[in-house]
Amino acid sequence: MEVGLSMVPRVDAFLLGAPKSGTTWLAEALTQHPGICVSEPKEPNMVATHKGTFPRDDSRPDWSAYSTCFATDGVRIDCSVHALACPLAPHRVAENWPAARFVICLREPVSRTISHWNMIRDTGEDVDNGSDWSDFAQAWSDPRLQCDTLYG
């Protein structure tokens, strides 16, 4: 499909999941197969408006930039896990890649949520985005953590 002056790249599959559910491990394992091209970076975040736990961006994807995320032909897999929780992603995928396949990684939600919360605190992502998740109850009241925890 052509959008403006740039072509939407071929993508065969999407690896989706909540943060801390094993997607990085699986993406790394998939890179070992010579017939698979995992997106580089792992999470180009072009299809979803969710650009991680905090940032959101509703602008149209830059298909030219997205094309550079796939270095080889093979089975192309976009590993932008946040597309699972993004309400716009299903429409974009259906419109541009109607035959795409999906691999979805899930994890028991309580330990996954605590692991995600700890990661956000360890990286300072909460503070960098104007939030204070130092207390779990306060973090849980933030709909962004709930969105990732409840799988969208």
Task: Map each language-model feature to its residues.
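A short acidic, amphipathic alpha-helical/loop segment
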Residues: 89-92
